[in-house]
């Protein structure tokens, strides 16, 4: 959506985010439809709106006009970041897996939702690992309703465990499950599991386990508190296409999600082969930014007009 000094990527997939629009834009009036929101953004300072929106927990991103004009692919976060950061517990040693049976001994616990984390878990399951998907009884995975076919495919063959995160008994069950896992996949902001004493440092300080933290913008402050989804984060990373009028548009369908799921699975398999343990910090933003740079460095372009797919699966 167009603003004064660039474009905004705004994702309102969660019903509660619609209720934040009036205080975010600091105005009264009907903002119950996308057209009303677009009108309200005209002439507004996009960068200031993004800063306020992120403090409020809105999934919003900013694309400066200079990125379009210069076609540089420069992201909104200067300096760039590696695709992922891995904090190892010890010196890794190479471990060879010659058959799927070798990986079948590995237990994966997937705490993530939507697309990127579940895709990673699905690919690890395809490699032979045992996957247990944990869901909240009070906050079910939105993909189960929004994309039921994709949800069934990504979770096929997994063990499923539904827990009440307000129950101390269920939290103890989850702690035991995480403690005995070889690989943990989680997609929440760092403070969420830390508040429940279910983060890696609380459960297994220095323990021999591989833990994937899959976030929108990474774990470091202040990025670790920012909310984001595949479309708006891809825009922030410079991964977008342009229509015939030169206006930026999203690529594909939440493209940062499947890309990040694939990157995460490849990284985990590589680290598992080295018998490595530690925390793998991977963000949708870094993956999108990396892919943008790869496309440009190879002489490719992203100028085709966007056509939304009918099905994700």
Regions found by a protein language model. Give the residues of each.
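Glycine-rich, charge-decorated loop segments at or immediately adjacent to ligand/cofactor-binding or catalytic sites
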Residues: 220-226
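Acyl-CoA thioester-binding alpha/beta core of soluble enzymes
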Residues: 1-140, 168-171, 175, 179-183, ...
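Glycine-rich phosphate-binding loop and adjoining beta1-alpha1-beta2 segment
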Residues: 134-161
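Flexible glycine/proline-rich, aromatic-decorated loop/lid segments
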Residues: 226-243
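Adenosine-nucleotide cofactor-binding segment
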Residues: 156, 160-174
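Glycine/threonine-rich flexible loop motifs
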Residues: 171, 188-200, 222
